[in-house]
Amino acid sequence: MVTVRALLLALAVSLFTAQPESSRPSFAEFLAGVRAEALSRGIREAVLDEALADIGEPSAVVIERDRTQAEAVLPLEKYVDQRLMPRQIAAGREMLARHHDLLEEIGAAYGVPPALIVGILGLESNFGRFSGVRPTIAALATLAWDPRRSALFRRELFAALEILNRGDIEFPKLRGSWAGAMGQVQFIPSSYLKFAVDYDGDGRRDIWATPADVFASIANYMQGHGWAADATWGREVKISGNAKRRIANEVERRDGTCQARRDMTTGLPVERWRALGVRTLNGQRLPPATPNAALVSGRSRSFLVYQNYDALLEYNCAHSYAIAAGLLADRIGARQAPRGEPTQQIPKAPQPPQAPRTRGQQAAEKPSLK
């Protein structure tokens, strides 16, 4: 009997093979072109022999997953509820307590709240428990050949080959998600090359198994995308039907490179949101706030979000993801925080120094005892 999954896989195959064959090379020809370009970029032949040898056909499963991402398919409210289950909040609090000193140190160095670091890790890999088993090179090769986002994934394929060429990880261990996201932090290869941190100073940026490198890499990514240490991400709010109509008529939508950025309003002063009828969840006036706030609305829940929300969208440009990350951090970092209260209840990390030092750098600066 034909299963639903088999039908989905057949549909996925048809989606990326429907275009005329004359418009693109066969998969084998594509891989040959990748090999030639990689050699011209300085990737060692031995690396390519190992990385490309066993890739026979493009993966229909990978294409299927690319068409049905949870953040894009599930309504915001359902996605958030699934990722804020009590067991996930408890697991986050346990990790926060177990690595308290290390997380406080990294939070202070990068200006990112420890609870946010842990919350992102919870969404990305269930607090490090699962980071994917799919061979990264094969997944990226499929997506680079598929025309939907070919240019993006072609860049990521060469970045992954560069990681192997540098010896950061052995090829058999280079596994991750269907989209080529790697390690507990689920960095795509280009993000790894730019933001991964060797915090423990052992010579490897190990986002797969070393807690210090994992936490610092997340913090470095958030800092690098504009997370401000002295600010919050946002808060849940209450909006009446009349207020929603006024907002739709009077407030402009934002421009942006991804759909999520276009599905939110421009930033307005809190006083303006008050005048439009936006209230706290318990119906009170919004408290004073210095930064402008934008409005993000799902089917039944709405949020005022600040500048730091943009940093969350940089990790994954979907409102369901960014809202879930912020709320999960709130729950992990503040046991008694009621639903919708902002991350002001989470102790702020101090302003980061100009150039955070890894533990290896710190050790090198200590006077020798010999």
Set out the residue ranges of the language-model regions:
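Acidic helix-start/capping segments at beta-turn-to-alpha-helix junctions
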Residues: L48-V73, L121-S125, P135-A138, E236-R245
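Acidic/His-rich structured neighborhood in mature extracellular/periplasmic domains
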Residues: E77-A219, Q223, W233
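C-terminal soluble interaction/assembly domains
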Residues: S240-K370
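Sec-dependent signal peptide recognition
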Residues: V2-A10
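Solvent-exposed loop/turn segments at secondary-structure junctions
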Residues: I55-P58, E124-G128, A181, R299-R301, ...
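Hydrophobic h-region of N-terminal signal peptides that target proteins for export
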Residues: L9-P20
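An acidic, Gly/Ser/Thr/Pro-rich helix-cap/linker signature
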Residues: E21-G107
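Flexible, glycine-rich surface segments
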Residues: F171, R175-S297
